[in-house]
């Protein structure tokens, strides 16, 4: 319960970087100033898709525990489209994203992903983000173009590693929602959790 409350507070803090009392130079371009001098958050009244695991799953713990997206819904009037399922790992993000697209099309303003704790618990190897090679390319910076050696990074799409799964998930999200804001939240810190005789993590 404490970790979920801490998570909700962290998200609220992250999303509330546009509070009252900011000077003119720090105001966000898409925000609107209200009559009392406060800044209206750019996500006010928006439609947000939530992908994840039990921390996001609306069916996990029923009405006993408010989820982080419940707090954002109350605070900002967000319409939540929630697709998190308990126990899922990063390799489920493409499926959740496709379901979001199927049911809501382009009618989503942003997507939040909170995932990874189950990958860690399952011992999924971390892996690498990309391979790096050198290539000869034509380039110019304030002078006539010439052949230069440049480094090229290619994302590793490896479904057996944590970083590879993230690359695959983000790639699919960008294909489905190329012009939408995507927010990644890091996994929560894990410690011993004894949920019963057959569920100790």
Report residues per predicted region.
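Compositionally biased, intrinsically disordered low-complexity segments
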Residues: 1, 14-17, 31, 35, ...
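Active-site-proximal beta-strand/loop segments in catalytic clefts of secreted hydrolases
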Residues: 51-54, 83-88, 114-117, 185-189
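N-terminal beta-loop-helix "entrance" segment that forms/cooperates
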Residues: 91-92
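Alpha-helical transmembrane segments and their juxtamembrane interfaces
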Residues: 12-14, 63, 191
């Amino acid at each position: 319960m404490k970790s979920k409350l801490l998570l909700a507070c962290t998200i609220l803090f992250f999303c509330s970087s546009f509070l009252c009392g900011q000077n003119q130079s720090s105001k966000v371009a898409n925000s609107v100033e209200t009559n009392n001098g406060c800044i209206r958050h750019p996500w006010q009244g928006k439609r947000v898709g939530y992908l994840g695991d039990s921390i996001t799953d609306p069916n996990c713990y029923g009405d006993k525990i408010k989820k982080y997206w419940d707090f954002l819904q109350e605070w900002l009037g967000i319409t939540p489209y929630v697709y998190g399922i308990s126990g899922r790992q990063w390799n489920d993000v493409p499926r959740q994203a496709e379901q979001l697209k199927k049911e809501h099309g382009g009618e989503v303003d942003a997507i939040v992903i909170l995932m990874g704790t189950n990958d860690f618990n399952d011992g999924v190897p971390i892996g690498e983000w990309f391979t790096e090679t050198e290539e000869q390319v034509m380039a110019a910076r304030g002078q006539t173009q010439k052949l230069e050696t440049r480094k090229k990074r290619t994302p590793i799409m490896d479904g057996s590693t944590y970083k590879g799964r993230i690359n695959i998930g983000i790639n699919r999200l960008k294909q489905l929602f190329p012009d939408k804001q995507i927010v990644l939240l890091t996994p929560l810190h894990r410690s011993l959790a004894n949920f019963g005789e057959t569920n100790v993590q």
